[in-house]
Curated annotation (Swiss-Prot):
Its EC number is 3.1.3.11. Mg(2+) 3 binds at D119, D122, E281. It comes from the Eukaryota. This is Fructose-1,6-bisphosphatase 1. The molecule has a highly reactive cysteine residue (Cys-117 or Cys-129), which tends to form mixed disulfides (e.g. with homocystine) but is not essential for enzyme activity. One of its GO terms (cellular component) is cytoplasm. Its cofactor is Mg(2+). The modification Phosphotyrosine is found at Y216, Y245, Y265. GO terms for molecular function: AMP binding; fructose 1,6-bisphosphate 1-phosphatase activity; identical protein binding; metal ion binding; monosaccharide binding; RNA polymerase II-specific DNA-binding transcription factor binding. Pfam families: FBPase, FBPase_C. The lineage of its organism: Eukaryota, Metazoa, Chordata, Craniata, Vertebrata. It comes from Sus scrofa. Subject to complex allosteric regulation. The enzyme can assume an active R-state, or an inactive T-state. Intermediate conformations may exist. AMP acts as an allosteric inhibitor. AMP binding affects the turnover of bound substrate and not the affinity for substrate. Fructose 2,6-bisphosphate acts as a competitive inhibitor. Fructose 2,6-bisphosphate and AMP have synergistic effects. AMP binds at V18, M19, E20, E21, G22, T28, G29, E30, M31, T32, K113, Y114, R141.
Length: 338
């Protein structure tokens, strides 16, 4: 094998991919600027995550965020990184972060046309034990001519123009969903670029894995209890489903996307409105899943149809392979009819 054969000289970077998509759509290039800036933050967070122990970034920063979670030092660093790079992209006007109580309004001289909702470091309760964590983001167009405000972020997920997540695992991967589908990019540390590795990703119609925190079993809705029982003891004597639950949404959803199956964080007696946040956790993941051919629901309605009233609103979420999610929805309907 020659050196040339071992080295791809026509690689598709994320920048090239987005520029090509933008050219097809005759865009202004602002989305490319925005995603390039986001990639810079993801690379920096990836580096910080990998050297967190040496740099003393583990542990608690000594406060809680707006939704009551303890803030870790890496959370603070990641949040500052994402905010600063998005502001300096000159493509955003409103930012919503899990870590900030109020929406961040970008300075007039730096404003663009996009609204970005993000969780800078999802799964951060797992940082200290080295479990995979990630960054989640959803991008909307500002849909009014008024001065930018928090209201610009209160759009249903159907209005998303792009969404995705970065996974800091055995490698750093960025999964990007846009109008034409879902594509996966791997960070090549040798050249510092995200390289397209999976084009137009589609989830399996039916999987063989279910993912839920069964520690809440006594609080579950009867429909969830029945569904899990069916997966463990199939009435048709087929092979039971495997159970996998990491406790880091990015890791659990990415596994579901790759292998198929179902991920559930439903409402329960303790959290009747669900626990995960709609704008920067549920909506982006639901958008990715639907663009990959899957389904995402609360059990009563499509996640992407919810019109938010608060930037930190919570929602139940069930997503995954269409046949698996449909089976659970049928059980919900059966119980609702009783």
């Amino acid at each position: 094998m020659t050196d040339q054969a071992a080295f791809d000289t026509n690689i598709v970077t994320l920048t090239r991919f987005v520029m090509e998509e933008g050219r097809k759509a005759r865009g202004t290039g602002e989305m490319t600027q925005l995603l390039n800036s986001l990639c810079t933050a993801v690379k920096a967070i990836s580096t910080a995550v990998r050297k967190a122990g040496i740099a003393h970034l583990y542990g608690i920063a000594g406060s809680t965020n707006v939704t009551g979670d303890q803030v870790k030092k890496l959370d603070v660093l990641s949040n500052d990184l994402v905010i600063n790079v998005l502001k300096s992209s000159f493509a955003t006007c409103v930012l919503v972060s899990e870590e900030d109580k109020n929406a961040i309004i970008v300075e007039p001289e730096k404003r663009g046309k996009y609204v970005v909702c993000f969780d800078p470091l999802d799964g951060s309760s797992n940082i200290d034990c080295l479990v995979s964590i990630g960054t989640i983001f959803g991008i909307y167009r500002k849909n009014s001519t008024d001065e930018p405000s928090e209201k610009d972020a209160l759009q249903p997920g159907r209005n998303l123009v792009a969404a995705g997540y970065a996974l800091y695992g055995s490698a750093t991967m960025l999964v990007l969903a846009m109008v034409n589908g879902v594509n996966c990019f791997m960070l090549d540390p040798a050249i510092g670029e995200f390289i397209l590795v999976d084009r137009d990703v589609k989830i399996k119609k039916k999987g063989s894995i279910y993912s839920i925190n069964e520690g809440y079993a006594k609080e579950f809705d009867p429909a969830i209890t029945e569904y899990i029982q069916r997966k463990k003891f199939p009435p048709d004597n087929s092979a039971p489903y495997g159970a996998r639950y990491v406790g880091s949404m990015v890791a659990d959803v990415h596994r579901t996307l790759v292998y198929g199956g179902i991920f559930m964080y439903p409402a329960n007696k303790k959290s009747p409105k669900g626990k995960l946040r709609l704008l920067y956790e549920c909506n982006p993941m639901a958008y990715v899943m639907e663009k990959a051919g899957g389904l995402a629901t609360t059990g009563k309605e499509a996640v992407l149809d919810i019109v938010p009233t608060d930037i930190h609103q919570r929602a139940p979420i069930i997503l995954g392979s269409p046949e698996d999610v449909t089976e659970l929805l049928e059980i919900y309907q059966k119980h609702a009819a009783k």
